[in-house]
């Protein structure tokens, strides 16, 4: 398990863009983390005031940050950054609303030099909310 302090040590993101609250499981190539979605999220002010829904792009960002925690926690990547290089086969299956807990899983399936490919999914109450294949570049 990695708490919020460990997450902040790995990631450069801060409020309001830090979208990982806790890491539940971590192994060499897979990480499972959570994001507790509350009505206090700043994006709910405009998306949508009468029907708040977490923007899909922010779900994907939360998945990317989850993968980033795994990659940037490795000694050889300390102090580096992870940048999006692409997204593929992204699907949104369930709306994420205030009160939901996103359970995010990212598994690295390919690495070549500074490029990494991750299969990622976000679930709410055991149901798939979003999934996709994310490509990252690791840099200084």
From Swiss-Prot:
GO biological process terms, semicolon-separated: fatty acid biosynthetic process; lipid A biosynthetic process
Reactions mediated catalytically: a (3R)-hydroxyacyl-[ACP] = a (2E)-enoyl-[ACP] + H2O
Lineage top rank: taxon: Bacteria
The entry's keywords: Cytoplasm, Lipid A biosynthesis, Lipid biosynthesis, Lipid metabolism, Lyase
A Pfam family it matches: FabA
EC number: 4.2.1.59
Active site: 47
Protein location: Cytoplasm
GO cellular component terms given for this protein: cytoplasm; membrane
Gene Ontology molecular function: (3R)-hydroxyacyl-[acyl-carrier-protein] dehydratase activity
Function text: Involved in unsaturated fatty acids biosynthesis. Catalyzes the dehydration of short chain beta-hydroxyacyl-ACPs and long chain saturated and unsaturated beta-hydroxyacyl-ACPs.
HAMAP family reported for this sequence: FabZ
Homology family: Belongs to the thioester dehydratase family. FabZ subfamily.
Protein name: 3-hydroxyacyl-[acyl-carrier-protein] dehydratase FabZ
Gene label: fabZ
